[in-house]
């Protein structure tokens, strides 16, 4: 619509096309006219005009784009004219009587209220600002809001006034009683800066917590550092060191820790050069993004150009990262807390799926189910080394890959991770509360950390929105797709995994017809899988190649056609409700194989059939089925 107005399309014409009330169209036109004017004459020179522009809703960043000035210059000119936002309380009492709820929003509109202009009223207490996670989306979910809330409760108990900054009404952190004061504002530089300056007008601002809300507030760490605003916990220098590939590689070399060969590219030409040097397979991803957005595994050179271009788009002005992909490796997630001298390794989680599946989508087990004890000990040692070398204060998350008993560091995030609530529940420890107190200056030793649930297995399983999007593809990869998670808890791993599947609305069958389609490289391992299925009273069916291989090893197996081989095919059989379990690691790069695999995955989704896309998940499912058949579910 604004584009139409810029092209001089009349309001009457837009109304006829859109049916939007002309009053709203007039408001949009006012904004468009302001944009045109700003491009022509630049920033207003007087208070009245500048304040009018701000009251319409133009951010400093947008003004900088329209006037070809830096955002810093725009901010300084605005402050020089004493154009600052005022904060108003949300009227939680519907004007029936005076509202005292400290639930603030900013405005540049003035002289429209009989109450005092600014209602923020910063107190004289010692205070801590917590930056929330902003809007929920894939990769940035309620797990981070949990951390922010727990930090607020804990710091209040420790005698600090807590101030929450967030803009998502669907979160607990924006409840009126979670913090002492809430600013319902975007997690953007201008808005956060204004809030900090307002709170610094009275009392003692101890610091700003940026590491609990995920990647959104962490992106503000550089801005806070540049403006000499106090960051609580891990400092920007450490955050930047962990994100800067060249410097981080040097640190790993110094610590004698292994990492897959990698490079960082600022241009397309650099990316191609690095890719040629490292060789396939590769992991291509943008820096400073969450949820694995635009992250891809490149197996063929023909895929490279498109994936690099998409990574640069997602990275915006940041470089992209290119790593050698460690194929067929086991991935491990570690959460830890450090006070700068001591390090507590809170949880070592083994991913059920192989490396290459985003950590937010992979099921995982705490404690690990098949990692050798000496490797667990070495992971603990490497975690402690990295925490101390990075001068971490508060949370740290590390992702490792293990292949042939060698440990590789994938990445380090000096912030809270999405697994913190899971580890806290599994260990029976309020980790976010402890980390916030450590960031405020307390020592780890004070908390006498001892887990309360030894001898138990906790399994985290991702929950996906595929049932709401029937044409979506179930195949998982490095870009996150899940929108939630559940947890299974038991003394037995198989039962814990079974419980996690029940909680994720993916209940496993105890018998029936299993359908198997395997890559050639998985067929030897698949024979053991087939034998286990028969022992569990399943009958076998498979695609022609897999079925013939199973028959060679003395087992009965029904052949079912792929979709491209003609009817009746696997989708027909799934639609007839005759399949109880699908294990499909097959696929390929030819068009008909890709289409076959997509059709199979969509049919399993439509018919609510449990579906395994890799051997490790299939093995975990068999463990769970064994437990369901031999143990009582409680």
Regions found by a protein language model. Name each.
Residues 56, 62-66:
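Extended, domain-scale alpha-helical bundle/helix-rich regions
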